[in-house]
Amino acid sequence: MAKHFEFTGDERVFEGVTVHRIRALVDLPELNVVAGDVGGWVESEDNLAESAWVMDEAVVCQDARVMDSAVVSGNAVVSGQAKVSGSVVVTDNAQVADGAKVSGSAVVSGQSQVRGKAKVNGSVTIMDNAQVCDDVELAGVITVSVNALVCGNALVTGEVLVTDNAQVRDDVEISGKVKFLGNAQVFGSALISGSCRIEDDAQVFEHAELYGRVRVKDRAQVHGSAVVYGKVKIKGKSNVH
C-alpha cells in the first residue's frame, strides 16, 4: 500500500522523543478517515503500516508498530517494541508497551496497561485499570477489567472474565468459561477449566486443578495437589488440599 499519511509540520517532545502530528493522504473508509484528516502523533513513518491510524492526542513512538486497520486514539500510548495489529483499538489513556503484542479485535481502554512480552489475541477487552504483563498469553473472548491483574506466565483461553481486584498469575492455565471476581487469587501452577467461578477472597494455588462447575468463594482455599471436579461449592474458610 502507498504511503497513507504525512507529517503536518507540528511536532512536540513526548517522554524525551520528538513526535510528529500526521495527516491522512488517502481515505481509510473502514476507519472513517478521509484524506486531509489530521491525526495523532508518531515518532517516525515506521510506526504506522498498512491502513493503521493514530488520532486525537494518542502517540505511537520508539520502535512500536501499529499495523493492518488498528487504531490508537484518545491519549493512548503505544511504545517500546510493541506491535498492535488486526482491528485492535487502543484508546483513552491505555498503554501498550515493551514487547507486548495485541492482535485480533481486542480493545484496550481506560487506564489499562499491556506490557512486557504479553500476547493478546482475539475478542479480548482490557479496560479500566486492569494490567496484563510479563509473558502472559490471552486468546479468546476474554475480559480483564476494573483493577484486575494477569501476569507471570499465565495462559488464559476461552471465554474468561477477570474483574474487580482479582489476580491470575504465575504459571496458571485457565480455559473454558471461568470467572474470577472480587479479590480472588489464582497462582502457582493451578489449572482451571469448565465453568468454574472463583470469587470473594478465595484462593486457588500450587498444583490444584478445578474442572466442571466448581465454585470457590468466601475465604476458601484450594491448593496442594487437590483435584476438584463436577458441580461443587467450596465456601467459608474451607481448606482443600
Predicted regions and their residues:
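Terminal amphipathic alpha-helical/low-complexity segments used for targeting or macromolecular assembly
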Residues: M1-S51, E57, N75, S87, ...
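Compositionally biased, low-structure terminal segments
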Residues: E6-T8, E15, L181, G188, ...
